[in-house]
Structures are given as C-alpha cells and as structure tokens.
Amino acid sequence: MAKSREINMNLPSADDLFTTQEERDHKNQEYVKDISIYEITDFPNHPFKVKMDDKMLETIESVRDHGVLVPALVREKPTGGYEMISGHRRKMASELAGKETMPCIVRNLSDDQAVIVMVDSNLQREEILPSEKAFAYKMKLDAMKRQGQRRDLTSVPLAQKFKGKTSREILGEQVGESQDQIRRYIRLTELIPEILEMVDDKKISMRPAVELSYLTKEEQEILYDTMESEACTPSHAQAIKIRKFSAEGRLNEDVLLSIMLEEKPNQVE
C-alpha cells in the first residue's frame, strides 16, 4: 500500500481573512496621537504608586502651562479604548490640570511584552519603594518565564538568546541586583499590606521582613496587632525565631508577645 503523504496547508488566520494588508501593517506599527484621558485605563495591578507629592504638583503646573511634553505609552484594548503602559503620573497630572487629551505612543504589545515594558520604564524613577520593586520584579520575572516557554517575536527561544541563563539571572543583570536580592524582594509580596507598608516606611528592614513573609496571613495579622500595641518591631534574630515557631506550628499570640518583648541590642538592623 502506498504511504499516504501528509499535506501541509498554511491556512490564513481570521485576522488575515477579515483585514486588509494595510490594516495589518498599521496594527504592527507604533504611532503618536492625542487620546482622551477618559479612554485610557490604568495598567492592571500597576505596582508603582502615583502619589500627590511635591513632584506631582510640579508636573501638574508644567502640564497646565506647556502640556505633556513626553508622550505616554499605551496599547489598544481588544474591547476598545487604551491601556496605559508608561505615563500614569502624566495622566493624573493631565486630569488635575484640566486637560481632556494627552499625546500617546500607541504600540502593539502582547500581555507579557506590556508587563516587561511597563516595569522597565517605571524602574527609571529616582525613588522606588521596596513594595514597588517587590511586585514589579515578580510581574516581570513571571512574564520572562512565560516568554522563555515559547518563542518571542524574533522566533528565537529566550533561553537560546541568553545562553541558558535563568530568567532570574537575566532580571538581576538588567536591574543591577543579585539573584538573592531579587528573591528577597519577591518574598515581600507575601506580606500583608499593613506590614509591607511598615517596610516602605523603614520601620522594618529587609532581612526581618523576608523572614516574616513565611508566616501565614493570620499569623502576620496577630504580629501586626502586637507591634501596634507594644510599639515595637522585630529584629532579624527575633524574626528568625518567630518564623521557626511558625514552621513548627507553635506560634500564637503569647509566644509572639514573649519574643517581641525580649531585649535586643538594636531595634533597627
């Protein structure tokens, strides 16, 4: 019996069938246009805070007098409108300055590409809180790992492009942090918001905070209440002890209180 031959047919996608070549080319090109600020939604789970501080007041005044000088970066949403990639502060300043539109670069980006570009553009800020780094590094690392499982737009596997380096190694090189420091920052995402805010406010330093991130949410809530009532925070040594009791299933309010009230040589490490 003659061996059947496999027929390879490259069928056009739905996008190819129902759009013109000009429309497809336009979709893959970036362009600048003025967009209503009401058509632009914030990036989902945007890790960087947009605060009303002195710098924001300066930005509002500049936008009021001169407009937005550097266009924001957005991508089109499948459901209509646009999603902000870079320019959340400029958008807020435009709103408060009474502007209806702002100039934007519209770029065609996949979900993972959008995450990476969003993080990279915001890491250029002069001041970045530990919580912002924590969630930004986690979001970018997850996106890089997903890209490593498939081919990117250049059709070259990421592992091949970076000679077998792990995503965490690549991220560390890009942001100037060691792999261990990347891991520590990402651990902070396991903290409850109240304790994470204490890290941002420099009431708890990084090393104790990492140890505390291994506690359950319920244990963290008890710890936070204890810190508030006793007006104290754990040292690194105390945090290690607290984590040990938690791992052994022996951590409760009384144990926490006894550890927190232990004399320590230095309150802040």
Residues of each region from the PLM?
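Short, charged/polar connector segments at secondary-structure boundaries
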Residues: 2-107, 113-127
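Residues that form generic nucleotide/phosphate-binding pockets
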Residues: 17, 62, 118, 122, ...
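Amphipathic alpha-helical extensions and coiled-coil-like segments
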Residues: 169-170, 175, 179-269
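Residue-level marker for well-ordered alpha-helical positions
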Residues: 57, 88, 166, 192-193
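Amphipathic, charge-rich alpha-helical segments that serve as recognition/docking helices
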Residues: 92-190, 200, 207, 214
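Structural motif corresponding to the C-terminal cap of alpha-helices
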Residues: 67, 72, 144-148, 193
